[in-house]
Structures are given as structure tokens and as C-alpha cells.
């Protein structure tokens, strides 16, 4: 009897809305996708963009750069974006905030949460407007400790039920760490993004080196890379240098480095990601490709 009453109420509800049961099920499918999908917010010092898996578009990914207003903070720009952004207005409940701030990497077997704040203060500058958080990188046997702006964090927390905050470089580190096992020679990686150069290397399933330099100059980038190359004792004939991202003066940079490092390579995202459809999205940063190319399961975690 109880089941009949429930069925009658459901039928009456559908009749009032002039929907049949099949239409009702179809109508809830987009809502379920919104509930389950994790929106990615990429925030740097001067840019904002949003991305989410979307099966209704050809590339299976909806990427939306946002034009920031100069003179106001990233947090203030994000508040404004919630009024106009197509993705932000969809009502996603889960978000992954990627922040581009200096990262202190701690070996996972040496990480002590009670000591990390003091260690961070000795290594980095923590502004009053920032709060310090950490993120475990299990594949790399490290913990990333970094700062996030309090106002930016508050804006995201106010709009989403489930929020994760990760370093912008996490996807790049993980992707290139997997590729580092190809071949027997040592490899140095240089990733260019947002007027910043990230240089890092791996060995025995962990970081051997990682540092970042603020530059958009190909000449300065070349100097920084070769300085690290020499510091790490790499072989200029046998070992490998891999460049990726938004490389300034790409042809000049590669040719200039080839004079000193014979095995210098520039990543081709189309080949790197096996012709994945997302590589055709104009303006999609390499770091976002590394997150989404593995599919909806990884991007929604």
C-alpha cells in the first residue's frame, strides 16, 4: 500500500510538470553530471581560467579563459567571474583550485606536520594575506607545502561544498615523472608557464632537484637551465634536456641550448598525449592537459 501511495504521488508530480518518467530521468542526467564533476580553477598571479569534463562538447572538455581586470586581486576577479562565467554559473559542487605559488617539497618520509610551518618560514616568505597548506604527492614520495591567498580560498570555499587545493605543477610533475623512466639516461625538465620557468629532475622515484625562476626572457631562461645542468653534473652529450609549455622564442631557445646540450627536446603535446582531442583546444595550458588527458576518473578525484 505504501508503495502504491508513493507511486501515485510521483505520477501526480510528473503530470503536474507535464513530464513522462523517461523525460524526468533524462532531465536529471545533467544534474547528476554537475554533482559528480570536479571543476578546475586555474589561478596564477595574472590569469584565471576554468575547465571541466563535458561530454556534450567534441573535445570532452570545456575550457574557459577569463579576462582578468588589472588593479584588483585574483580573489576579486574570481568573485566577478561568478556573475558571468559559463562554467561557474553551472552550479558545480566540487572544485580543484590550482594555485601558482612557490612550493617547498619535503620528502614524504621526513614530513612532520608539527614542524612544517617553521621549516616553511625558513625557506619561503609567508605573507599576512596568505595561509600555508600542504598536499601529499604519493607518486613522487613528497609533500608539497605552499601558500594560498586567504581571500581566494574564501571565495572558493563559499561557492563549493568539496574543495581541493593543489599546486599548479602537480599534473606536470606526475606526467613527466612517469615519462622519466623511458630510457636509461638522466633527464632535466624545464616547464614554461605564466612568465615562470620551473626546472626539475627525478631519480629513484623522487625529486632530485626542483626550483622556479621568474622570467619571460629566453636568454635568462637559457642561463638558469644551464646553471642547473652544470650544478647537477649532467653530461652534455649523453643526458637529456626536455622543454615544455609556453616557451619564449621557442626556436631560438632550442637551438641555443643545443649548442651546449646535444639531446635537447621540445615536447609536442599532440604526440605527447597520443593525439588526445583536448590537445586541439586553443590556449589550453600544458599543465591542464596533464590533468585531463587521463580522463574523467582522474580529473574528478
Label the predicted regions.
Residues 1-18:
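N-terminal Rossmann-like FAD-binding beta1-loop-alpha1 element of flavoenzymes
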Amino acid at each position: 500500500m505504501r508503495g502504491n501511495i508513493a507511486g501515485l504521488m510521483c505520477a501526480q508530480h510528473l503530470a503536474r510538470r507535464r513530464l513522462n518518467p523517461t523525460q524526468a530521468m533524462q532531465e536529471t542526467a545533467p544534474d547528476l553530471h554537475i554533482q559528480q564533476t570536479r571543476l578546475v580553477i586555474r589561478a596564477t598571479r595574472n590569469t584565471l581560467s576554468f575547465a571541466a569534463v563535458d561530454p556534450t562538447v567534441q573535445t570532452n572538455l570545456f575550457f574557459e579563459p577569463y579576462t582578468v581586470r588589472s588593479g584588483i586581486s585574483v580573489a576579486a576577479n574570481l568573485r566577478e567571474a561568478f556573475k558571468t562565467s559559463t562554467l561557474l554559473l553551472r552550479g558545480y559542487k566540487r572544485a580543484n583550485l590550482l594555485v601558482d605559488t612557490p612550493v617547498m617539497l619535503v620528502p614524504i618520509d621526513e614530513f612532520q606536520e608539527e614542524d612544517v610551518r617553521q621549516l616553511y618560514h625558513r625557506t619561503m616568505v609567508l605573507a599576512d594575506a596568505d595561509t600555508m597548506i600542504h598536499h601529499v604527492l604519493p607518486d613522487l614520495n613528497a609533500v608539497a607545502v605552499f601558500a594560498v591567498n586567504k581571500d581566494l580560498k574564501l571565495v572558493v570555499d563559499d561557492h563549493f561544498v568539496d574543495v581541493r587545493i593543489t599546486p599548479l605543477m602537480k599534473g606536470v610533475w606526475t606526467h613527466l615523472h612517469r615519462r622519466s623512466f623511458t630510457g636509461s639516461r638522466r633527464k632535466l625538465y624545464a616547464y614554461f608557464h605564466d612568465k615562470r620557468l620551473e626546472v626539475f629532475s627525478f631519480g629513484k622515484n623522487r625529486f632530485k632537484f626542483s626550483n622556479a625562476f621568474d622570467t619571460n626572457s629566453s636568454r635568462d631562461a637559457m642561463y638558469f637551465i644551464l646553471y642547473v645542468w652544470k650544478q647537477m653534473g649532467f653530461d652534455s652529450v649523453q643526458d637529456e634536456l626536455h622543454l615544455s609549455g609556453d616557451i619564449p622564442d621557442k626556436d631560438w631557445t632550442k637551438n641555443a641550448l643545443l649548442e651546449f646540450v646535444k639531446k635537447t627536446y621540445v615536447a609536442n603535446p599532440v604526440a605527447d598525449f597520443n593525439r588526445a582531442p583536448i590537445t586541439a583546444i586553443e590556449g589550453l595550458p600544458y599543465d591542464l592537459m596533464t590533468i585531463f588527458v587521463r580522463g574523467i576518473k582522474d580529473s574528478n578525484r
